[in-house]
Design a protein with these regions (language model features):
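Intrinsic-disorder-linked linear interaction elements in eukaryotic regulatory proteins
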Residues: 1-510
Length: 510
């Protein structure tokens, strides 16, 4: 009969009383008690006992004693598996230090702890830091264990995957190309580790927009996943979804939708119609239909998906919010701008409640909402929303940040639509000063702003100033792009058009 945690706790208390906190029998009993707590899923209690026992162990032998290594390793692994990644990382870092002090910097215990620190950093979003550690561990394992040792290859794989997460896809692909033959030689082509590395190669090709190669790699990898993991395994569904995304990015819309439809059907059978994975594939399917320009069918799918997510999760769930956004974007694409604007407005209110007025997500949504209002011809309301978004963006990102600059530009353009030319001119002057600072005098952004500034001068009737701006702008466009470039011709065509008009030109924004 297996003793319960309650029984083991009583036994432990007796030993602590009789033999003392530092006795070996007490240590063993304490470990058994912790194991029972973990088995009974009493994780908070187990964490507290781990911490207490580790403190006693340090008191007995010293914090840097090798006698603390097994218990600290066990505690760190427990924290990691329990999802307490930050505290786990702290314990692994101390474990690495103690192991290096007692066993040496390239001892396997030290390298294992160091690698676990990197895993924790990865989970916490510090991918750059994790990549640096993975690189050091891989180098040490090559020196200590040899280049083809399984541990060395595993560390190499961790480093390769981490490179991809940092956005260094070219470097990640190069490592994949070198690593795959080693994996095949050591473990074989059908080993799950080899199969997973093929998936990483496909992802790197995908990220580098080498779509034909990526599609071929994905197709072969999917077959391997089905053989190795089975058609119903979550990892098989994941790689199939990545393949569908790659097809879509490669503009194979029909193939992408067909594959996503099959993926959705299989997910409903394997996981059920309301499983989060199924609902995500449903969202991808609805979006794919829109990419095929099947807007009405896409809207019907989004409508049903939104109703399902509202019923299951409520309006504040991230997946529900994501679907509302997708639905609104398709409405915009179908030229139902007023309907789209209503959904954007509702979405903004929901996100503000959860994240606050100046959260970056609110700024992004407010900008999208303003564009929808602009497309619907509601210029006054659009200018108000652009103004709110730009003020928040200035506070959050700063006056020279690209996101603030873009929103500010859209606000100025909307003022022109409202015939508020004097205000628009002031905004364009400020924008030009910032654009020259962050983009440069000869950048396309600066040239476009000078064009808008010139047109606004014409609209205000400041014809002499406008023609002066025009002459300099044509000279600069010719110098930067050449006489026959579309940008140069566009400016010249506007000048010719204005010169041929007697009356004041109409709204300068097309």
């Amino acid at each position: 009969m297996i003793a319960t945690s309650t029984q083991l706790k009583t036994h432990l208390a007796e030993l602590q009383e009789r033999s003392g906190m530092h006795h070996p029998d007490t240590y063993r009993a304490w470990n058994e008690y912790i194991d029972a707590l973990v088995a009974e899923n009493q994780l908070d209690a187990a964490a507290a006992e781990f911490s207490a026992l580790l403190t006693v162990r340090e008191q007995s032998y010293g914090k840097k004693s090798s006698e603390t290594i097994p218990l600290r390793r066990k505690f760190a692994n427990f924290l990691y598996q329990a999802g307490d990644v930050r505290d786990a990382g702290t314990q692994f870092a101390v474990l690495q230090e103690v192991a290096a002090h007692n066993l040496g910097p390239e001892h396997l215990e030290t390298l294992h702890a160091q690698e676990q620190v990197a895993q924790c950093l990865n989970r916490l979003g510090n991918v750059e830091g994790a990549t640096q550690i993975f690189s050091r561990v891989y180098t040490s394992r090559r020196h200590v264990q040899g280049k083809d040792h399984p541990d060395t290859l595993t560390s190499w794989a961790h480093y390769t995957v981490s490179l991809g997460k940092t956005g260094k896809h070219k470097e990640a692909l190069a490592e994949c190309e070198k690593l795959l033959p080693r994996f095949t030689a050591v473990w074989g082509e059908t080993d799950e580790r080899t199969v997973i590395m093929h998936a990483k190669r496909a992802a790197a090709l995908h990220a580098l927009q080498r779509y034909d190669e990526a599609i071929e790699e994905y197709e072969q990898t999917i077959e391997s996943y089905v053989r190795v993991f089975g058609p119903a395994d979550p990892s098989t569904f994941k790689i199939r979804n990545q393949y569908a995304i790659c097809l879509s990015n490669a503009h194979h819309a029909d193939a992408a939708v067909a594959h996503t439809a099959a993926l959705l059907d299989d997910s409903r059978k394997v996981f059920g119609p309301h499983h989060p994975k199924t609902l995500r594939y449903w969202n991808s399917y609805a979006a794919g239909l829109a990419n095929q320009n099947e807007l009405e069918e896409s809207l019907m799918e989004f409508h049903d998906l939104l109703a399902t997510r509202l019923e299951l999760f409520g309006e504040n769930h991230p997946d529900t919010l994501h679907t509302i956004l997708g639905y609104a974007k398709i409405l915009d694409g179908a030229n139902r701008h007023e309907d789209a604007a209503e959904f954007y407005r509702a979405l903004i209110d929901l996100v503000i409640k959860d994240r606050g007025e100046n959260h970056p997500d609110v700024i992004r949504l407010r900008t999208i909402y303003a564009r929808s209002l602009l497309a619907a011809g509601n210029y006054e309301k659009a200018s108000t929303e652009f103004d709110l978004a730009r003020r928040a963006a200035r506070d959050v990102f700063g006056e020279t940040h690209k996101r603030y600059f873009i929103i500010w530009s859209q606000y100025a353009t909307t003022l022109v639509c409202l015939d508020r030319y004097e205000e628009a001119l002031t905004e364009f002057e400020g924008l030009l000063a910032v654009s020259r600072q962050i983009n440069g005098d000869d950048s396309l952004e600066t040239i476009e702003l000078r064009y808008d500034y010139m047109r606004t001068l014409f609209a205000l009737g400041r014809v002499d100033d406008a023609w002066s701006e025009y002459d300099v702008l044509v000279q600069d466009c010719t110098r930067i792009y050449g006489e026959d470039h579309s940008t140069t011709r566009h400016v010249q065509e506007f000048g010719a058009q204005f010169a041929g008009e007697i009356a004041e030109p109409k709204n300068p924004v097309e």
